[in-house]
Every structure is written in C-alpha cells, then in structure tokens.
A protein has these predicted regions:
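Positively charged, low-complexity terminal tracts
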Residues: 1-106
Length: 106
C-alpha cells in the first residue's frame, strides 16, 4: 500500500441499499491513497478523527478502462472545464499514459 495523501478538493461517497443509504464526505481534512495491484486499482478515502470514516473501492482494469472512456465522453459533451481543473486532469492523464508505456527489460 502507498502512503496517505491529503485531499486538496473533496469526494462524496454514497451506497444505496433497498432499506437504507450511506453517504460520506471526504474534504480537506481527509486523506486518500490510490494503488495498483496485479488485477485492479484501489482508491481509499479516510476521514480521521472522532467521526472517522473510511471508504475503499477496488476496480478491475477492464472496468477502469470503461470508466475512463465514459468520463472522456462526458467531459467532451459539456462546457469546457476551468483552466485549473483542466490542467490538473491533463497532467494526471499524461502521467497515467507514461506509466502504461512498455518498459525496457532490466
């Protein structure tokens, strides 16, 4: 696992069951970690303190690819994002692309 990082923006998580719903917010006082293993990626959100909450989501690579395609379609169909968010997302996407390039054999 990787170290926890501060959340600079925010995330909201909701899980709906037939008889109840769970909703949690993770803001600037929360932390996250994201990591990859052989089959999937995981995102873990942690809100420390008295009202501690933790949410973990594991997504297999095929589903992650489908999600990224749908996010790209959704972003392309809406008004352009502001400069800051556009830059942050482009830099992260470029880093992801570089990490997927074939690596020389050691």
């Amino acid at each position: 696992m990787s170290p926890l990082h501060p959340i600079a923006d925010k995330a909201e998580v909701s899980v709906d069951f037939p008889d109840k719903a769970y909703i949690g917010s993770f803001t600037r006082h929360s932390q996250f970690e994201a990591y990859a293993d052989d089959d999937s990626v995981a995102i873990r959100l942690v809100r420390p303190g008295e009202d501690r909450r933790e949410a973990v989501m594991h997504v297999h690579y095929g589903l992650l690819a489908d999600i990224l395609v749908e996010l790209a379609r959704s972003l392309a169909s809406r008004p352009e994002l502001d400069e800051q968010h556009r830059t942050e997302l482009k830099e992260a996407a470029n880093q992801l692309c570089r990490s997927l390039e074939p690596r020389p054999e050691s």
